[in-house]
Structures are given as structure tokens and as C-alpha cells.
Amino acid sequence: MFYCTGEGILWISPDDRLIVSRLPAGTYTDVGQEYRRLALRPCTPSATPAFFLDTPEMRMVRREVEAFFDPAATARLQAVGLRHRRGIILHGPPGTGKRTMMRQLIPFLVERDAVILVDCDADYLEHALIPAIRASDPDRPIVLLFDAFDRDVSLSRAKLLQLLDGLTSPDHLLMIGCTNDFNAIPVQLRNRPSRFGLILRIDRLPDGVHERLAEQKYPTLSPADRQFAVRLTRNLPINFLERVCEMFLAGCDPDEISDRFRAIAPAESTDGHERR
């Protein structure tokens, strides 16, 4: 049971506010520390148009998520006494599209009536948030998204282990975590198929992604400016392309952008060789 404030905050403890017996499908974040009580806030959709990746890795992730919502698969698990849970870890260097892939799943998850909880404390999840969601809706699918999974593991390792694979861990639970440092995740957490059925390393963005992103996200730039930005950042994480495009939007010319770019880019040239 939840109690809604005029600002859209959802308390878990009883209150004299509007009662919300069933959370609408959508994305929520824990704001309990801000309000000193257990509470959720709906996440505001980004005003930036989503950039959709269509890669073999994205299709693998999509199939794994679709399998979680397959009623036949759920029934088979229940028939043999297994909990309905799946876990996915996306790892690799920064700027290779891991978090873009995770965000790209959100519309599909909402269509499947899921409650999506972003970067929530593991102890709150098992002992307060998930029970409150399930109180009036015991089979509701819940999806946990962790933007920096290695950080969350370092803060609450034992709690995450309990949440994922403990005797009281919740049913109908999908967890997706992203990390730039896979080795920071303990072996006992990642080496259990019951916890993470898909662990996927993403080393680089496929060819053509920089061009498509520049065209889709920055349509007001001239083709020449977009091509310049793509050439300058082709072998670098996608956030460098965005920085260069934003410099063009701010009125910088190519020479000025090149000078600024040398100060912010890693020690690697656009042809893949280390700068001297």
C-alpha cells in the first residue's frame, strides 16, 4: 500500500494522503534518505530523444528480457519449485552503449506492466519496497536497474546476495546491472546462473553508430559538422561525440573544437594510435 503526496512522492508508511493500492507501471527511484522515511519518486522521462541501438548484443539482451515475461517459462519454473528470477550484467569500457541498452528496455518493460526500481538500496528492496508493491499485487513483475553495479555491490554485497539468492528472496524479479569494472564484482555473486543468466561484455560500439547517433540526436547540425564530429571521435566512447556536437551547437568552429578536444580526449588519436 502506498500513500501519494501532491508532489507525486509515494510514502510506504500509513498516512492521511491519497491511497495508491497498485503502482502504475513505470520507473521509480528511492528517495527515503531525502525524506527520512521509505518513499518512492516516479522518474521523469528524459526530454532527450532515445537513441536506439540495434546490435547483436542488444538483441541478446532483449531475448533474455522477453524470456522473463514468457508465461510458459514461468510455469515451467514454478512446476519444479524454482523461483521466477533472471539477472543480466552488462560490462565493458565506458561509452560502449551499456546504459543506452538498459534505458532502451524501459518502454518494453512498462508495456509488460513492470515496476522498475532504479539504484535502490538492497536492504530496503527486500524488507520494505518489494513487500509494499506485492502486498496487493503478489505476482507483479519487478525490475531492478543498477547504473553502476560495482558501486552498489561494494556498498551492500551481503544484502545483494540475500536479495538475489537467499531463502526469502522475492519471486518474479529481473535485475539488470551495468559496470565498467567487472572484476570489482565478487566471484560468488557473478558465478551463479541462478543469479545472472546473461553476463555480456561489450567492447566497442559497432560501425555506423556514431554516424546514426549524430544524425538522430543533433539534426540541426550541418552534415559537414556531424561528419567532422564523427571523424574526430570514431574510436572513442560515445560521450566524446556528444561533447563535440555540443561544442558546435555552442558556436565553436572546427579549429577551436580540435584544440579543446585535445584537452579532454584520452591519450588516443582517432586512428586508434596513442598520441605522443
Segments from the language model and where they lie:
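C-terminal alpha-helical "lid" subdomain
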Residues: F2-G26, R192-S194, L198-R276
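Conserved phosphate/pyrophosphate-binding and hydrolysis machinery centered on Walker-type P-loop NTPases
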Residues: F51-T55, T179, R231-P237
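Walker A/P-loop NTP-binding motif of AAA+ ATPase domains
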Residues: P56-R62, E66-Q227
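AAA+ P-loop ATPase mechanoenzymes
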Residues: M1-G95, M101-D113, D121, A265, ...
